[in-house]
A protein has these predicted regions:
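Short, His- and charge-rich active-site/binding loops that engage polyanionic ligands
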Residues: 102
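Conserved catalytic core of two-metal-ion nucleotidyltransferases
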Residues: 29-92, 112-209, 214-243
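A short secondary-structure junction signal
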Residues: 94-99
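Active-site nucleotide-donor binding segment shared across nucleotidyl transfer reactions
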Residues: 1-16, 20-29, 33, 179, ...
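Mobile amphipathic helical/loop "lid" adjacent to a hydrophobic cofactor/ligand pocket
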Residues: 108-110
Length: 243
């Protein structure tokens, strides 16, 4: 939306994500050990036991961006970050698709709230009760394995027609046609050219409705509860004409 509506960063948005198809995401993870520059750290569930994000965070070494939540975990890397997420396939059958996405979303909420030490607040009292019983019974490691299995359950599916935001905040928004992400076009973003889906209009309407309508000033908030920030050697950095 930033690229289309603002031709760059959304002024009040403090977050930037990169999304990939599952096959590209898995390949990305496979080349990280040999290709990642020394000034970056790839934070995953595998290399930091206290980190349970379902996606990968690329963090800048010798910087700090501590939020209200992550400040509770001093042993994890809390550098300035960029999130890298996969878009996963789901069933072509409408009923099975609904079950898969509901189960995936539920497993993610269980992991999140188990990690945070908070109660699950579901759509109904009964659902909340069941979820919190599961949260108390099962260890975090087990819940995380279930979550990861559900996220990529259909990764080897033949002729998939639907994708969903398996790792991101739109996991409960439902599936969308996989063909929307088949092709990319290059658009202006600040002083650079970056790729976005050719069917960006359909994708953005699926996410936001009338995405060209500006939200009220009163609703323009950052998405992170930042407690402390240190840009390190980048404190005096000025953006160049191109990336």
């Amino acid at each position: 939306m930033g690229a289309v509506r603002h031709k760059g960063f959304i002024p009040w948005d403090d977050d930037a994500d990169v999304m990939m198809l599952r096959k590209d995401y898995d390949r990305f993870l496979s080349v990280l050990p040999s290709e990642l520059p020394n000034y970056l750290f790839a934070q995953t569930q595998k290399n930091e036991k206290d980190s349970h994000f379902p996606f990968t965070k690329l963090r800048i070494n010798d910087t700090l961006l501590s939020t209200e939540f992550t400040s509770r975990f001093p042993n994890i890397h809390n550098g300035i970050f960029l999130d890298v997420l996969a878009q996963d396939y789901t069933s072509n059958n409408a009923f099975l698709r609904k079950i898969h996405m509901k189960a995936t979303a539920s497993s993610r909420w269980l992991v999140r709230d188990k990690w945070r030490g908070t109660s699950v607040n579901a759509n109904s009292r009964f659902s909340s009760l069941c979820a919190n019983i599961l949260r108390k019974i099962f260890p975090l490691g087990f819940l995380q394995k279930v979550q990861n299995k559900l996220i990529s359950l259909h990764k080897n599916m033949k002729n998939p027609k639907y994708l969903f935001d398996s790792m991101g905040r739109n996991v409960s928004r439902g599936a969308f046609p996989a063909e929307w992400l088949d092709e990319a076009i290059w658009v202006d973003f600040e002083n650079a050219k970056l790729p976005i889906p050719k069917e960006y209009d359909k994708y953005l309407k699926y996410l936001y409705g009338d995405y060209m309508e500006m939200i009220p000033v009163s609703e323009r908030h950052v998405s992170h509860d930042i407690k402390q920030i240190d840009l390190g050697e980048y404190a005096g950095y000025v953006c160049k004409d191109s990336f």
